[in-house]
Amino acid sequence: MQSKSKSGTRYMIQLAIMASLVGAIGTSSAVFAAPTDNEAAFTAPPVNAAEAQAQESWRVDMARHGAPAEGCYSASYPSILWKKAACVAAPAKYRSKVPSRSGSVFGDSTHTKSQAAGHAQTVGNGEVFVVQGPGLLSGTVGSFPTVSGVTSETGSDGSNDYTLQLNTNFNGTTSTCKSYSYCTVWQQFIYESDVSSGYVFIQYWLFSYGSSTRSGGTCPSGWNDAGADPDGIGEDCYVNSSAISAPAVAASQLANVKLSGSVVSGGNDTTVFTNGTTAYTLTTKDSKVNIAAVWNQSEFNIVGDGGGSAATFNTGSTITVKDAVTDGSTSAPTCVGPSDAGFTGETNNLTLTGSCTATGASSPYIQFTESN
């Protein structure tokens, strides 16, 4: 028979357990409550400073180390092991706008005149800072170290409709161009947030591919024909890789994400998207356009969801953009731009504020701020 003392002690323990369970249920409800209309996408729960730093270090590590084999993989903090995941088709509707590559600011005369008058320009379509290393790049990591005042973002399809784009330069010719002397290649590492779902994939381009007569039908088998090249001869061709599904992320949570791209000549191209405590990666052969042979500039930003569209932020939004490179050097890279720079045809409604800073480090980087 239990003594009254032991019985009382057990009763107190039971009360404590019940109280902790009630508290846990309350906390869980708060963390996983149904999102509001303006925050329909993933929102990370708050963590303390030490845990936040640990998670940030994990995101940096995962962004720099993709899976060793082709395919789609995911990982969850704190594990650094990639687990095989299903690959899906990239969004069929997605196609980045083909920017002009010959005129000042992509052939937009109105844009050029406004620049000459000293007017601020919205980011994208030729108005942005890009990073350039002393030689070829083997990888870059894009992030947003500081995000303030952002409560909403709207794209052509609704709230949280945008892309994170990490783009290579598009003035290089590789063996993929065959004997077409005007042909150049371009590659985009993309995270697409499409209102309620997300995808991570790579889009490849061939510009001015084919014969000197714009007869059409010259794209390689399996590629999509984007029409006659507006600046040269031949056709513009594009194709998407497979994709890995990821959550849509609320624009207010951009400080928790990173997008990276890495290439190995004769090996694999890899893109990694990290979101809070989860990472998603896709790996394909570099031989698609052989971008490793010509990649020397990188553009990273948040812009519209393809087709030359815009990502529109609420008034009072400020975002700091960081683009860190791997180029075999610890020297400070070069800030290129903002005029006549960048490679995407998409935009946002923010303007560049202040200058671009370039910093040498184990992973050299540039950093700049945009706001409205």
PLM regions and their residue ranges:
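Sec/Tat signal peptide C-region and signal peptidase I cleavage site
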Residues: 29-33
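Intrinsic structural disorder/low-complexity segments
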Residues: 5, 17, 190-191
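N-terminal secretory signal peptides that target proteins for export/translocation
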Residues: 1-10
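Exposed, interaction-prone regions of secreted/extracellular proteins
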Residues: 34-372
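Alpha-helical context
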Residues: 13-16, 118
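Bacterial N-terminal signal peptides
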Residues: 15-26
